[in-house]
Amino acid sequence: MPHLHLSLQSGNNLILKRMKRRHSREQAIDVCRNLKAARPELTFGADLIAGFPTESDTMFLDTIKLVDECDISWLHIFPYSGRPNTPASRMPQVNKHEISKRSKALRDLAQQKRMQHFAKLKEKTLSVLMESEFKGRAEDFTEITTSTPLKTGEIYALKVDSYNADSLIARD
């Protein structure tokens, strides 16, 4: 299935270093571009943390930009929550209101990216593995619903008629 989920966490190099991540922003972008060049149909998902200690507005904007630079369609957003007795707990904290605001901005971006992805798939026929009678997943991990019950565990060629905020809507 041409879907890859990346644990990026942030789009800012200093924040990544403070998180003790082993990759840089530039490495993430290079990996995504190289993979997309080799497999254009590949979609990316990513985990992102909003409000890690010391994250400034400019650092946060680096994360927003990274979503476009890596062509990420699926975002899993986590507001930072501290753990006692960790290195991050001893760093200057971002206030809770700002963490909430940044989390919302990332969730809004996630919805926008999802809608763009769905729009690209409208009117296409996709191979769908049914996970339940009315829901399945396309090869790129996109959820698809049907109005007709289909056999769980089977793969169907379904044409995408429309979409809503959460999934594609297909006919068989």
Regions found by a protein language model. Give the residues of each.
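Conserved non-cysteine loop/helix-boundary elements of the Radical SAM core domain that shape
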Residues: 1-73, 84-98
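Structural beta-strand/beta-sheet cores of well-ordered domains, especially the beta-sheet scaffolds
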Residues: 2, 42, 73-76, 124-126, ...
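Generic beta-strand/beta-sheet core signal
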Residues: 7-9, 47, 78, 131, ...
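A general marker of short, structured functional hotspots
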Residues: 48, 56, 74-76, 137, ...
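Mobile beta-alpha loop/short-helix "lid" or hinge segments that flank ligand
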Residues: 78-84
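Terminal RNA-binding accessory module
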Residues: 82, 89-172
